[in-house]
């Protein structure tokens, strides 16, 4: 609520900046500010929206990148001081700031930048004593990573990391919660091929609004390198009370092209 401090921070970051609700998520509670003249009013509006939506008016400022990619790092850590990364994922394909397609590893990332950020994420887990599965999210532009946040939970897109490393993230999460050490070391985590996940949503394709109702026929795809995570079945009624995602289709291949082709066929 300190106007002068907010202006100073924004000037130091450099316009454009983005005002974000600290308690926000799913693409809500964000406002881009291109000029200094609009900063204070944008902060006030975002605070009001955040208070109404999340019960918390706290906001913060970040540098707004014009053409970034969304790249994140999957980590696992236990109570014995061990931590590993399961490489990275690209989640750039979104609508309304919500992910719809994810892949691992993230294509076209500078190798040196990747190595540095993977090591930094593992070091951060050890330094803070983190336990469980987690994801460090970044924006990536022009060979540089910009930290967004850490999600201290399992994410929807975790299967692509499982497919390219062979590590069962859910099993490890439950095991370390019970006090056991990780069953893998960093040397055990070997990148194998490429994986892609498509989120299947019960939505109107024109408006992207949720479309609850009866699923008359459901025939999931199968075959080599194809995985389906879902709870639905023929005759299932999609309720109107929850998120519209009803399934995840994941494909794995020796190369990105093979994973894409298998997804296209699926």
Predicted stretch roles:
Residues 1-22, 29:
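A conserved helix-loop-beta module that forms one wall/lid of the active-site cleft
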Residues 21, 26, 33-266:
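ATP-dependent carboxylate activation and anion-phosphoryl transfer catalytic cores
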């Amino acid at each position: 609520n300190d106007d002068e401090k907010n202006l100073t921070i924004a000037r130091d970051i450099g316009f454009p900046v983005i005002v974000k609700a600290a308690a926000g998520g799913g693409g809500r509670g964000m406002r881009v500010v291109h000029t200094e003249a609009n900063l204070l009013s944008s902060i006030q509006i975002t605070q009001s929206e955040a208070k109404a939506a999340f019960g918390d008016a706290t906001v913060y400022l970040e540098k707004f990148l014009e053409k970034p990619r969304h790249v994140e790092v999957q980590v696992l850590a236990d109570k014995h001081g061990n931590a590993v990364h399961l490489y990275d994922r690209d989640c750039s394909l979104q609508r309304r700031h919500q992910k719809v397609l994810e892949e691992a590893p993230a294509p076209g990332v500078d190798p040196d930048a990747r190595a540095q950020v993977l090591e930094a994420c593992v070091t951060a887990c050890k330094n803070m004593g983190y336990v469980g599965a987690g994801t460090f999210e970044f924006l990536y532009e022009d060979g540089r990573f910009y930290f967004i946040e850490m999600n201290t939970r399992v994410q929807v897109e975790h299967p692509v990391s499982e497919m390219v490393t062979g590590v069962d993230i859910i099993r490890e999460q439950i095991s370390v919660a019970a006090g056991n050490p990780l069953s893998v070391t960093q040397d055990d985590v070997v990148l194998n091929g490429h994986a892609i996940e498509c989120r299947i949503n019960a939505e109107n394709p024109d408006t992207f609004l949720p479309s609850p109702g009866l699923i008359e026929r459901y025939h999931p795809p199968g075959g080599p390198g194809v995985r389906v995570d879902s709870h639905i079945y023929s005759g299932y009624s999609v309720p109107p009370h929850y998120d519209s995602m009803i399934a995840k289709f994941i494909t794995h291949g020796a190369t990105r092209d093979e994973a894409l082709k298998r997804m296209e066929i699926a």
